[in-house]
Amino acid sequence: PVTAGDFVYAWRRAASPELASPYAWYMSLMAVEGVDAVIAGEAPLDSLGVSAPDDHTLVVQLSTPLPYFAQMTTHATTFPVPQAVIEEFGDAWTQPDHIVSNGAYVLSDHVPQERSVRVRNDMYWNNDATIIEEVVALVINDENQALTRYLAGELDRTEVPAGQYPRLSEEYPDEALSFPR
C-alpha cells in the first residue's frame, strides 16, 4: 500500500542535490519550506518542509501562501515512489518488471521514443469499473502525422496541430475538444 512516507521520499528525491533531478525546479516553484537550500546542498534533505506523522497523513509546509498549490500536486514529480523498490533495483526501478503502479493500469512494456503499453491493474481499488483492458501510447513527434493517423482510424486521440482547431472543430464537432493544459 501507498503511505504518506512514499510521498516524503519522492519529494526529497526530487529536491536532492545528489540526484540532481531535472524537476528540482518544480519543487522550488511549489514553495516547499527549505527547498532552495536543500537543492543547493546547503541544508539536509530532512529539513525539507514535508513530513509524514503517520502512514495516512502528509504535512507540507510552504514558505509562502500558494493558492494553486493543490493543482501543482498533480505533476508526476509529486507522486509517491516506493523506497524499498528503488533501493532494491536502483536505476532499473522504473522498468516494467519492477515499477510499482497505483492507478488503474500497470506498465507492461516500454520502448523509449516509440511506445508504452499499460494493462489493467488487478490491485486497483476500482478495478471492477475499469473497462479498457490495455492502453497503448505511441510517441509521434510530428503532430500533423499524428492527426493523419487519427483521421485514418489508427489512433483514438491526438493533439491538434497549432492553428488547425477551428477547422477541425467544424468538421468534427463531436471529436475536436479544447481544454486548458
Residue ranges of model-derived segments:
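Periplasmic solute-binding protein
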Residues: P1, S63, R181
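Aromatic- and charge-enriched surface segment that lines or borders ligand/interaction sites
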Residues: P1-Y26, P53, V59, A146-A152
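Periplasmic-binding protein-like
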Residues: V2, F69-T73, R167
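Alpha-helix initiation and N-capping motif
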Residues: A4, Y23, L66, A162-Y165
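Gly/Pro-rich hinge or "lid" segments in bacterial periplasmic/extracellular proteins
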Residues: V32-S47, P53-T57, Q61-E134, D142-N144
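Extracellular/periplasmic solute-recognition and catalytic clefts
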Residues: S108-V119, M123, V136-R181
